Amino acid sequence: MILGLGNPGLEFSLTRHNVGFSLLDRIISKNGLFLKRKKKYEYSEMRMISGRVILVKPLTYMNLSGSLFPSIFSDFYMCIKNLLVVLDNVDLPLGKCRLKERGGASTHNGLKSISSILGSSNYSRLYIGVGSNVMRDIKSFVLSRFCKDEIDRLEKLYDFLSDELIDISEANFKNKVQKINSSNF
């Protein structure tokens, strides 16, 4: 399962906080998929030779992302180790990514919410760099929109990541980490 973090609503589209949603939108459109709606999230499914890939976009605000997991667990019978969370990172330069097998919630409230509900941080995450915070107020920065040049760079990154993430598995995870973490757009 790939969970893209973001805030629902048009007012948040193309903001730095919504790169998780933007990447999932690219994967969905590139593969001719459609979103289906549940009470707390939207999702799409792909059947692959290696199994199915479920793409999820929460309908909750970022800081409440963990609240959808009771529904997800009952709907899809998933295991935490098969979860990949895609989110923004203000400490990474724009266009740089970091794929990690597990880790702490750090200061990201979306991850804190997920880890709190799951009772574990034993899941993978893909951090997408959204640029350095030149503003003092982190909230204003992550809710700000990208400029055209930044969007162009991110479009290339989303194309690359959509190809790389579709066939990610336990068997090839280390190779994907190396390829994704060494990329720069």
From Swiss-Prot:
Any single Gene Ontology cellular-component annotation: cytoplasm
Catalyzes what?
an N-acyl-L-alpha-aminoacyl-tRNA + H2O = an N-acyl-L-amino acid + a tRNA + H(+)
PANTHER family linked = PEPTIDYL-TRNA HYDROLASE
Its protein name is: Peptidyl-tRNA hydrolase
* Annotated keywords: Cytoplasm, Hydrolase, RNA-binding, tRNA-binding
Q: Enumerate the active-site residues.
A: H17
Q: Where in the cell is it found?
A: Cytoplasm
Q: Does the keyword Hydrolase apply?
A: yes
Site (Stabilizes the basic form of H active site to accept a proton) found at D88
Q: Where are the transmembrane segments?
A: none
Establish whether keyword Hydrolase is in the entry. yes
GO MF term list: peptidyl-tRNA hydrolase activity; tRNA binding
Instruction: Identify the species of origin.
Output: Borrelia garinii subsp. bavariensis (strain ATCC BAA-2496 / DSM 23469 / PBi) (Borreliella bavariensis)
Family named by the database record = Belongs to the PTH family.
User: Do you know which CDD domains this protein is assigned to?
Assistant: PTH (cd00462)
GO biological process: any one?
rescue of stalled ribosome
- List of residues binding tRNA: F12, Y61, N63, N109
Subunit:
Monomer.
At what residues does the UniProt record annotate the site feature described as Discriminates between blocked and unblocked aminoacyl-tRNA? N7
Give the protein's function: Hydrolyzes ribosome-free peptidyl-tRNAs (with 1 or more amino acids incorporated), which drop off the ribosome during protein synthesis, or as a result of ribosome stalling. Catalyzes the release of premature peptidyl moieties from peptidyl-tRNA molecules trapped in stalled 50S ribosomal subunits, and thus maintains levels of free tRNAs and 50S ribosomes.
Please tell me where this protein is predominantly located. Answer: cytoplasm
- Indicate the segments annotated as coiled coil, or none if absent: none
Give the enzyme's EC designation.
3.1.1.29
